[in-house]
């Protein structure tokens, strides 16, 4: 038999053995459940123990809810997402949706084990769903090759639990805002049935974290925004005149030489996924590094700097995904008390974990339900307000659009996401708040890419 036929022969043999096992054990027809398949889960759900929830009553209903009803959304099908999907599918979750806007790159294959070389270039969500649907009997994984912003509140409301394996703080903040917008209040009291729990995991090298967020009840992403480190940027003066690191050379080529030379035609943007673009940046970076006797510029480093790649270690992904999947299981079954509410993991020097309770901020712009108070002089310019919204550690907005109600009409003071409106409202940035007609106690509505909700600010003059 040819070597190419050997894997197919093994696959058929495995299917035959599985069919024989189901027949011997008393298989359940076309349901895909053979006797003993869920014994490992039943041990947690059909008997009590010292760590079970005080209100938990062992029964078969929890397992049936897991198998037949519970619907989970996984956001991200990368290194963490692959581990999450595998863990959830093997834990009994059968109604799984996965969202990912990326396609598979060769560099993903060393740790994102649901993908194979033949899958390079295909959407991660679709390939991950195909793999699990084929490998795990009766598991139904529905892929969405989209951005999370492509879906409305009706889509997110259908899920019992949402778990994230993202590498983007903006995306985290957006889904956090979406889940908060789903909350219902009656006479100021939160309706618990409107809560969609969010389990969030993140990794960087040998470090990671996992957290449980119950929107409206526990600290949300915005409550602890200061915990996220700012993106590493190098001073332009250093990049241009005094480079000392390989990264300085790469950033110089990316930020200055590429726009100036436009090597692939006028207006062609740099694409971090295009090997030709990366190769050009790599060669030019080597040339600049040689001028300053700097060593260490490699193709891989070039790609990492251009794409802002976060270093990934497979074992860290496995640990954090296991924590997240365990929390999903605990919340879905109510068998155990969930994490309260933030866990950090460090595997740099030995093994270290620490759990603490992140506290809600009374004036959180996302979950407090209160307008945010800001103080400025009447002579302050609108540009100063814009700078505050983008530079404040507790806000960190990216492209805020500011509107206000003036003389009974809703007026856009500044909006930069639409070119024509940005040009029309740009002169407002140099005007004072008094010149714009704003008064003490004025409410400003601010929209931003970091949240699907409009954030209200109350302006107080000093």
Swiss-Prot record:
Signal peptide: none annotated. One of its GO terms (cellular component) is nucleus. Pfam families: E2_bind, ThiF. Binding of TP53BP2 to the regulatory subunit NAE1 decreases activity. Keywords: Acetylation, ATP-binding, Cell cycle, Ligase, Nucleotide-binding, Ubl conjugation pathway. Its EC number is 6.2.1.64. Residues 368-462 are annotated as: Interaction with UBE2M core domain. The active site is at 237 (glycyl thioester intermediate). The modification N-acetylalanine is found at residue 2. Residues 53-70, 157-161, 192-217, 331-338 are annotated as: Interaction with UBE2M N-terminus. It comes from the Eukaryota. One of its GO terms (biological process) is endomitotic cell cycle. Pathway: Protein modification; protein neddylation. ATP binds at residues 100-124, 148-171. The record marks 211 as: Determines specificity for NEDD8. Residues 227-229, 352-357 are annotated as: Interaction with NEDD8. GO terms for molecular function: ATP binding; identical protein binding; NEDD8 activating enzyme activity; protein heterodimerization activity. It is linked to Defects in Uba3 are a cause of embryonic lethality. Mouse embryos deficient in Uba3 die at the preimplantation stage. Heterodimer of UBA3 and NAE1. Interacts with NEDD8, UBE2F and UBE2M. Binds ESR1 and ESR2 with bound steroid ligand. Interacts with TBATA. Arg-211 acts as a selectivity gate, preventing misactivation of ubiquitin by this NEDD8-specific E1 complex. Belongs to the ubiquitin-activating E1 family. UBA3 subfamily. This is NEDD8-activating enzyme E1 catalytic subunit. It comes from Mus musculus (Mouse).
